[in-house]
Design a protein with these regions (language model features):
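Zinc-dependent deaminase catalytic domain
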Residues: 1-152
Length: 152
């Protein structure tokens, strides 16, 4: 079964995630501008589905040793680089990780790699993450924060 980009909103609503339209618009716009067939994006939302932080894969080729910053790390680092009010820090959060194809408009496997998994696990308490949702070709997998160690 192929899940299209258009179905993301419906699938996230099944997870009780109701993001603002402009967040969906941003994701679609970024996917369409992407040069790669595989676009990864991560979103950190508060308990009311307000977007707190956003990150996508970034590729750095201008150095002697080219590297990639995965969307999960980019999103979390973006959170730390902002001036976040204490009441927002105290709120429970959801980390959503999506892999989208810009060419065939479908969801893909976005389960965090081992390094990103460790990075997320090391930041769960500080970020107050209650669950992580990641895409698969069939839809979404939702993992509660106390079960993240089993996600590997």
């Amino acid at each position: 079964m192929i899940i299209g980009i258009d179905n993301i909103k419906h699938l996230l609503q099944l997870e009780n995630i109701y993001m603002a339209e402009n967040v969906y618009d941003r994701i679609v716009r970024d996917v369409e501008c992407c040069n790669s067939d595989k676009f990864h994006v991560s979103l950190l939302l508060d308990q009311d589905s307000n977007l707190i932080s956003y990150g996508h894969n970034e590729y750095f080729f201008g150095t002697k040793y080219p590297f990639t910053c995965h969307s999960e790390v980019n999103c979390i680092n973006s959170y730390y680089s902002k001036k976040i009010k204490q009441y927002v820090k105290d709120r429970k959060k959801v980390l959503i990780i999506l892999r989208l194809s810009s060419k065939i408009k479908k969801l893909g496997q976005s389960k965090p790699c081992k390094k990103c998994h460790n990075f997320i696990e090391n930041n769960i308490d500080n970020l107050n993450i209650k669950k992580i949702i990641y895409s698969t070709p069939e839809g979404f997998v939702s993992v509660k924060s106390n079960k993240v160690s089993e996600m590997e």
